[in-house]
Amino acid sequence: MTHPKELPLASLQFYATAPYPCSYLAGRQARSQVATPSHLIHADTYSGLVANGFRRSGMFTYRPYCDGCRACVPLRVPVAGFQPSRSQRRAWKAHQGLQSRVLRLCFVPEHYQLYLRYQAGRHAGGGMDHDSIDQYTQFLLQSRVNSRLVEFREPAPEGQLGTLKMVSILDILNDGLSAVYTFYEPDPDASYGTYNVLWQIEQTRQLKLPHVYLGYWIGESPKMSYKAQFRPNERLVDGVWQPEPRDETVGSPRQG
């Protein structure tokens, strides 16, 4: 793991949190390394942090800093070489009729209600299915960097809004897009999550930027292992972005 002093971020300080229960691997303790102060983390600085394995949650910029565990591996997709799988092509075809609208971060009651349905349907009992408006806002709608909120709706007559199906929060970096969080209608027959990643890959191509950062790949966690299905991909190992292992076999857990 790259030590903070090796980063070109001399104005920042880094501290390790106390241990807390891991959200992805049962029975394990996690720790994070947090970059501070947040008001100095502007767009350029944040791009450098993401390239070094950090992520953003609200105003907090962090990366895993766990004792004796390196299961969380930063993963990004080089969009120029991306080739969708057969199932990914099906997901794109199924949902390409959705209409996207890119907005500044803003609170919309309809978004919040969809967020609660998503948490209840996909992550019931995970602690976020009863988030208050304040918790939702702090988690997704507070940012000091170049962030956007993207709505995905069913088609509707001109002048009307179609049914909301998905909302995605993303950050625009110097070298690509960073997928912060996506929530959607918990329809077991839909593939909204897969479609969203494909949409971000296509947007990144249109912006003529090289990468989509998908956060942490965790091979042992079905919730996080799906990211390796977007190929080819690169992982940050010992401070260096490396191509995925050629002999890796990737399963296909349902990712919505």
Curated annotation (Swiss-Prot):
Functions in the N-end rule pathway of protein degradation where it conjugates Leu from its aminoacyl-tRNA to the N-termini of proteins containing an N-terminal aspartate or glutamate. Belongs to the R-transferase family. Bpt subfamily. It is an enzyme of class 2 (transferase). Its EC number is 2.3.2.29. It catalyses: N-terminal L-glutamyl-[protein] + L-leucyl-tRNA(Leu) = N-terminal L-leucyl-L-glutamyl-[protein] + tRNA(Leu) + H(+); N-terminal L-aspartyl-[protein] + L-leucyl-tRNA(Leu) = N-terminal L-leucyl-L-aspartyl-[protein] + tRNA(Leu) + H(+). One of its GO terms (biological process) is ubiquitin-dependent protein catabolic process via the N-end rule pathway. Keywords: Acyltransferase, Cytoplasm, Transferase. It is found in: Cytoplasm. Pfam families: ATE_C (PF04377), ATE_N (PF04376). The keyword Transferase applies. This is Aspartate/glutamate leucyltransferase. One of its GO terms (cellular component) is cytoplasm. One of its GO terms (molecular function) is leucyl-tRNA--protein transferase activity. Its main location: cytoplasm. It comes from Methylibium petroleiphilum (strain ATCC BAA-1232 / LMG 22953 / PM1). The keyword rRNA-binding does not apply.
